[in-house]
């Protein structure tokens, strides 16, 4: 992915920043997500917030019921100490011990954030993110027919319409999805294993794809 003339990379659904942390060659990186506790966690770690190495199940339950006491900690526990990284989707344990996932999640997050020290983290709806002219835009939305953090579904028709608008107004747009409308072309794909729950038999493979908009030719 080559940096555009303006040198700005904008992620509209940054999540855990697995992709964003590997982006290089840009003078400015903007990471957005509508989940305020997630952004509080990322901003906190960026500013030196000390994450815990252990989180007990009792602490997990307490934080789940008192989310606003410490939003950065809530973001970390809600995702990093939950099964499969699902927002407060159940206290996660190591298979071979009764410890939480906190230490491993902390290590992974600190490694991710090591390359994002100068990134700008913002919390907005994806349509409200200020995008500098000529930016590279990356969107990794919730998959079609799945629910987001709060149980809401993304309006996929509206999403793709907005991606077209961004591309048609001078931005370079990349979308990570399983499928896309015909006017978006797949430029990369890879099979990935997924899981619905703790049951190993429920794991399955799907093909993750990267699409970009094909501007109409005259």
Language model: regions and residue ranges:
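Class I S-adenosyl-L-methionine
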Residues: 1-30, 34, 104, 118-138, ...
């Amino acid at each position: 992915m080559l940096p555009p003339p303006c040198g700005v990379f904008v992620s509209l659904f940054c999540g855990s920043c697995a992709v964003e942390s590997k982006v290089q060659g840009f003078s400015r990186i903007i990471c957005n997500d509508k989940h305020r506790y997630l952004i509080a966690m990322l901003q906190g770690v960026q500013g030196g917030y000390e994450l815990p190495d252990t989180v007990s199940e009792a602490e997990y339950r307490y934080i789940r019921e008192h989310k606003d006491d410490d939003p950065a900690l809530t973001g970390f526990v809600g995702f990093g100490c939950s099964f499969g990284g699902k927002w407060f989707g159940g206290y996660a344990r190591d298979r071979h011990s009764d410890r939480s996932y906190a230490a491993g999640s902390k290590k992974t997050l600190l490694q991710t954030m090591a390359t994002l020290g100068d990134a700008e983290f913002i919390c907005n709806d994806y349509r409200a993110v200020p995008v500098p002219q000529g930016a590279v835009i990356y969107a990794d939305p919730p998959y079609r027919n799945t629910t987001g953090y709060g149980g809401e579904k993304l309006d996929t028709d509206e999403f793709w319409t907005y991606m077209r608008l961004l591309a048609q107004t001078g931005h370079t747009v990349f979308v990570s999805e399983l499928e896309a409308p015909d006017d978006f072309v797949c430029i990369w794909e890879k099979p990935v294993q997924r899981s619905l729950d703790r049951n190993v038999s429920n794991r399955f493979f799907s093909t993750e794809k990267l699409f970009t908009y094909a501007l109409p030719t005259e």
